[in-house]
Amino acid sequence: MKQKEFTTRMYSEAIRERMQELNMSKADLIRTAEISRDTLNRALEGKSVQMATIVAICDALGVGRDESNDFWETDYYDPKFDRP
């Protein structure tokens, strides 16, 4: 039996809401989080991203430890959806 693989995803609505609250553009978030546009787009599409990306985006958005679970989840890896 093949073991299931897991991945981490971000909640795009939560990211967009926080960006709006902070009056932050995508370019601002990319610059502050020090990530690429492709990486941000993956996060906003709900595709798998690395934990370092989640930390960078949450830090850039000022997400506190107590609310970080509202921004990301661990889920089953789906090769059809998660491949770059």
Model-predicted segments: where are they?
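Short, basic-rich loop-to-helix N-cap that marks the start of a DNA-contacting helix
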Residues: 42, 46-59
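A short, Lys/Arg-rich alpha-helix, primarily the initiator
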Residues: 1-28
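Residues in soluble alpha-helical coiled-coils and helical-bundle/repeat scaffolds
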Residues: 20, 24, 44-48, 66
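Short C-terminal boundary/hinge segments that cap the last helix of small helical domains
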Residues: 62-83
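Short alpha-helical DNA-recognition segment
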Residues: 21-41
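The DNA-recognition helices of helix-turn-helix-type DNA-binding domains
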Residues: 36, 47, 75
